[in-house]
Amino acid sequence: MEPVECPRGLLPRPCRVLVLLNPQGGKGKALQLFQSRVQPFLEEAEITFKLILTERKNHARELVCAEELGHWDALAVMSGDGLMHEVVNGLMERPDWETAIQKPLCSLPGGSGNALAASVNHYAGYEQVTNEDLLINCTLLLCRRRLSPMNLLSLHTASGLRLYSVLSLSWGFVADVDLESEKYRRLGEIRFTVGTFFRLASLRIYQGQLAYLPVGTVASKRPASTLVQKGPVDTHLVPLEEPVPSHWTVVPEQDFVLVLVLLHTHLSSELFAAPMGRCEAGVMHLFYVRAGVSRAALLRLFLAMQKGKHMELDCPYLVHVPVVAFRLEPRSQRGVFSVDGELMVCEAVQGQVHPNYLWMVCGSRDAPSGRDSRRGPPPEEP
């Protein structure tokens, strides 16, 4: 099969797409929804596709590691955010990761956590919607073929793991809700509402050290020992055994209800977590809630977050900072981390954002402005 060219910022017409679908995601109806809601639009828009159903955890990761990507103009992922996490990490594990990660991606919501799709929906100028309405909007964006670059978060853990996030890392309340609501996944995204009320009933406090590199901070010199591994070089990070560089900000408080690092606007299709808008290139949102917040105040925050109004409450315990890197060192192994909705062992972790590092189907062809916007258009196939 001959590869095709990808014009700047647009998928070609006709277009070939590899669709990875988790039939067990969300309410377990993703396949039926694809056949009834997505497929007719694709056929009309001259988008041919191959559909692969994932069979187990990390199946999508294995598939994209081995796939001949030149056969496809884009990869579409129909599930929750976790399957996109698998795909991106699979692409970054390939020997040709530098070109593989530029293969355009499309998020089709079919899971119980659809924050990435909700964010793309927001960037396209659509109203906040859920379920089949959100799926149809994202399908229409694929049919329109427009691409936009997105930031990528590189993470390192104390045990030596390196992984990548396309959406978020959370610790504390949000991660607990992710974990404990898993048993309600057949309810769809309402599982998070149920989980929130259960967790509010028994609010936990987590102890740890949080540090970050704010946007606009200029170092007198680059750290002497930056992390160098396969993949993009994390120039702002030093090994976890070393103290953070002196130009970083260390949060004096060490008791938290939650810490959230977020690359996009939504935490779910019904949680507009970052109403300040799309991150600039090379920037991510850091939110944390300090211990001392009451259950009632925390509930008000999450209820207001449904409409993006939580920052207007001026809660003294809620802090938001735009950052380019962070480090979080839990004092114990109690609890978990959630990375793009996928659970990770609780241990020291740090990360930095890489600007405009991957391409996604989106409603706007404009790249996020700001820091070091280096990525060009997706490469044309030879």
UniProtKB/Swiss-Prot annotation:
Assembly information from the UniProt record: Interacts with ACY1. Binds to calmodulin. Interacts with SPHKAP. Interacts with CIB1, the interaction occurs in a calcium-dependent manner. Interacts with TRAF2. Interacts with EEF1A1; the interaction enhances SPHK1 kinase activity.
All residue ranges annotated as the DAGKc domain in the record: 12-159
PTM sites of type Phosphoserine: 225
Phenotype reported upon loss of the gene: Mutants are viable, fertile and without any obvious abnormalities. Mutant mice show reduced SPP levels in serum. Conditional mutants in neurons exhibit a decrease of amyloid-beta phagocytic activity. Double knockout for SPHK1 and SPHK2 causes embryonic lethality. Between 11.5 dpc and 12.5 dpc embryos exhibit cranial hemorrhage and die at 13.5 dpc. At 11.5 dpc the wall of the dorsal aorta is poorly developed and endothelial cells are severely defective in all blood vessels in the mesenchymal region of the head. Double knockout embryos also show a neural tube deffect.
UniProt keyword Hydrolase, yes or no: no
Pfam family, one: DAGK_cat
Full protein name: Sphingosine kinase 1
Binding site for ATP: 22-24, 54-58, 86, 111-113, 185, 191, 340-342
Tissue: Widely expressed. Expressed in brain (at protein level). Detected in neurons.
SUPFAM superfamilies: NAD kinase/diacylglycerol kinase-like (SSF111331)
Species this protein is from: Mus musculus
Cofactor dependency: Mg(2+)
